[in-house]
């Protein structure tokens, strides 16, 4: 069995300073080559030069062992370079091509697909008139006797997407067990209030169209509902009995814009 010579006997003599490292083996008959690694040179204080002596066309096992031992000496030398994050970043920049990341915005339907929070409630104006459904799409305000209170409309008030400001909360008002929502549309030059039939598979939803959205504002023990689509227009009732609920442009006058809200248990 062949024996491996002791590395210390075959170790190349070497000389190093701040700028170069020189390795020699086997005497003057050998041909010398000089290698300077440009990338490594840029990573430390000085360049690293490695001179390896080898006989032309005769690479003996002994010389290979000598090179390995010399490289171990180089790796453990006092001038060994400490590998930093910047070094890894510079290497990776040559391997991988940097590409810009493009963010695509999704539609509001996907961004706002969380379940809609809602409460059931009844509304009476400050004159204690109740809101009732007088015909399929007409909402009226009138006084009810105790035995008639079952006619009172129950609203499903949904909290929808919109800007909350000055204690104003965006809500939509639908009628319980009906596919009807209060909405604001313009007839001629005047905004008006109507009951609009909707698809129950789609509504209610977080991102309601603006015509369905009202700012709910609490004032002492009452609430008022301002149209988001038409600012300063409010859900209103008349002083006169059994008149349709409408969209009014005046507060604190003959038109009643403040309501008492009774929240019902789920």
From Swiss-Prot:
CDD domains: beta-trefoil_IL1B (cd23296)
Any one Gene Ontology cellular component term annotated for this protein: lysosome
Predominant location: cytoplasm
A Gene Ontology biological process term: cytokine-mediated signaling pathway
Propeptide part(s) removed at maturation, as residue ranges: 1-113
Entry's localization field: Cytoplasm, Cytosol; Secreted; Lysosome; Secreted, Extracellular exosome
Keyword field contains Secreted: yes
GO molecular function, one term: interleukin-1 receptor binding
Regions annotated as coiled coil: none
Keywords tagged on the record: Cytokine, Cytoplasm, Inflammatory response, Lysosome, Mitogen, Pyrogen, Secreted
Heme recorded as keyword: no
Assembly and interaction partners: Monomer. In its precursor form, weakly interacts with full-length MEFV; the mature cytokine does not interact at all. Interacts with integrins ITGAV:ITGBV and ITGA5:ITGB1; integrin-binding is required for IL1B signaling. Interacts with cargo receptor TMED10; the interaction is direct and is required for the secretion of IL1B mature form. Interacts with HSP90AB1; the interaction facilitates cargo translocation into the ERGIC. Interacts with HSP90B1; the interaction facilitates cargo translocation into the ERGIC.
Additional facts recorded: IL1B production occurs in 2 steps, each being controlled by different stimuli. First, inflammatory signals, such as LPS, stimulate the synthesis and promote the accumulation of cytosolic stores of pro-IL1B (priming). Then additional signals are required for inflammasome assembly, leading to CASP1 activation, pro-IL1B processing and eventually secretion of the active cytokine. IL1B processing and secretion are temporarily associated.
Name listed for the protein in its UniProt record: Interleukin-1 beta
Annotated organism of origin: Bubalus carabanensis (Swamp type water buffalo)
